[in-house]
Regions:
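Bacterial N-terminal signal peptides that target proteins for export
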Residues: 2-12
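Sec/Tat signal peptide C-region and signal peptidase I cleavage site
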Residues: 22-26
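Hydrophobic, well-structured mid-protein blocks that either form specific transmembrane helices
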Residues: 121-162
Length: 269
């Protein structure tokens, strides 16, 4: 990832990264947070000259399917700005990922139209000798493909970490606690961490208030760690992101929950 000025869809997903373990690897784990059929939707907002405007929407869904002959979770994320926001910054993104029933990543693809850029990212995972081998591919706006092979444990794309990390329990965390991991896309595998900031109540766009965990996401793109976003996730077994605040070059942005359905547990936050 190269800039904080794009990938709003990623911000929806990093809201779950706080649950990842420092020592996480490709070893499978039991899913305790979601079930097939879960669907989440959000309103996107931009702050333009101190005025918040409705900028578009995003949605995330998870289903059980088949991938190369085995049962797998398929997760899909779409994000789209509306006509008004398109005047400032266009987003038309579709992301898809597959992971095993015990949450080991298999394949990831991201088709993005952000501003004037059109990229296609792919990540293929293979595990051998206790190591995670990743084949990265990015096709840029000019149509040229760029390839890279990376071997690095504790690495996940945004969708696979969203699914995997929701089953971790942060109940023992204290203010300032940090969790480290690596984030991979079609070009880079960057170190990142989440810093815990306590609990607070947050309003959704569905006339409901939620008790949430406050978290800040930092990523190192080669020039030191920078804070990308602050976000709030339900303080219950579902660990669903409710609100995400993001600073962009042209102003601020946020995503607020609109609809939650197919959740594994009743919302108790």
């Amino acid at each position: 990832m190269n800039s904080r000025t794009h990938k709003l869809e990623n911000v929806l997903l990093v809201a779950m990264l706080f649950l990842a373990s420092v020592g996480a690897s490709a070893q499978g784990m039991t899913n305790t947070a979601f079930k097939s059929g879960e669907y989440l939707s959000y309103n996107l907002y931009f702050n333009w000259k101190f005025v918040w405007i409705k900028a578009g929407n995003a949605s995330f869904s998870t289903t059980m399917t088949r991938y190369k002959g085995q049962n797998a979770y398929k997760s899909s994320l779409t994000a789209k700005t509306n006509a008004r926001a398109d005047k400032f910054y266009v987003i038309r993104d579709i992301l898809t990922a597959y992971c095993t029933g015990n949450l080991v990543p298999l394949f990831y693809t991201k088709n993005t139209h952000e501003g004037n850029r059109r990229n296609l990212d792919e990540v293929t995972y293979q595990f051998s000798g206790g190591k995670c081998h990743m084949k990265l591919r990015r096709r840029k706006t000019d149509g040229v493909n760029h390839y890279k092979n990376v071997v690095r444990n504790n690495s996940f794309d945004m969708l696979s970490i969203f699914l995997r990390a929701r089953s971790w329990n942060p109940s023992g965390w204290r203010n300032g606690y940090k969790v480290g991991f690596n984030i991979v896309d079609g070009k880079n595998c960057n170190p990142a961490y989440i810093q815990y900031g306590g609990k607070t109540n947050v309003d959704g766009d569905n006339n409901r208030k939620y008790r949430c965990l406050k978290l800040s996401y930092y990523e190192n793109e080669g020039k030191g760690y920078k804070r990308i976003a602050t976000f709030y996730v339900t303080d219950d077994q579902n660990h669903i992101p409710i609100l995400i605040d993001l600073n962009l070059k042209f102003g601020s942005a946020k995503a607020k929950i609109v609809n939650i359905r197919g959740n594994r547990y009743p919302i108790r936050a």
